[in-house]
């Protein structure tokens, strides 16, 4: 399913004023939008804006008109919203180009599988699309409309995998004092 999301993002990001490159780290997409007077050879300062676009292995159970059309796949956790916001930004910014520099819109796959960003970086994301700063896009339903939360440095969630071995003697919930942990 990441390939279908990537194809949709690449097709919708390709518009006058934007150059979309797909297959960054296999299924990642980057759309570069050059401000007025800027080009690939004269990019100026560059800012990256990143949104996740992976569907999760979840079956959506509801009757909404916007229910997933792919059984067993759902753009949960706001991923569809993040993708839509970045695509809308691409449309507006490519049309106006009323800024100085370059915007690299980064559509990251496989956030939940812990491999999308790593694959894009290993494929030369920042060598191919240099960024002076990168902002991660994530919805925040508790924040008032029209507001942004910005913090310097790493701020979004990270996942790690660890193996833990616990040695002891199991017990029963009715007699926890007999367990050893």
Predicted region positions:
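Acidic/His- and Gly-rich active-site-bordering loop/insert found
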Residues: 1-75, 84-87, 91-99
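Histidine/acidic-residue-rich, glycine-tolerant segments that coordinate divalent metal ions
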Residues: 56-58, 64-74, 81, 99-181
């Amino acid at each position: 399913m990441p390939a279908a999301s990537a194809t949709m993002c690449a097709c919708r990001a390709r518009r006058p004023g934007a150059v979309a490159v797909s297959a960054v780290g296999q299924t990642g997409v980057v759309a570069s939008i050059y401000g007025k007077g800027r080009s690939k050879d004269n990019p100026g300062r560059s800012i990256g804006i990143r949104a996740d676009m992976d569907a999760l292995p979840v079956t959506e159970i509801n009757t909404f008109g916007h229910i997933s059309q792919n059984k067993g796949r759902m753009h949960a956790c706001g991923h569809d919203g993040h993708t839509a916001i970045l695509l809308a930004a691409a449309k507006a910014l490519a049309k106006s180009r009323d800024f100085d520099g370059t915007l690299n819109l980064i559509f990251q796959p496989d956030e939940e599988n812990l491999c999308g960003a790593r694959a894009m970086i290993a494929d030369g994301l920042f060598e191919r699309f240099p960024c002076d700063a990168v902002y991660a896009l994530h919805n925040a339903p508790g924040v008032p409309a029209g507001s942004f939360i910005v913090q310097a440095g790493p701020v979004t969630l990270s996942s790690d995998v660890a193996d833990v071995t616990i040695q002891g003697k199991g017990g029963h919930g009715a007699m926890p004092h007999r367990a050893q942990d």
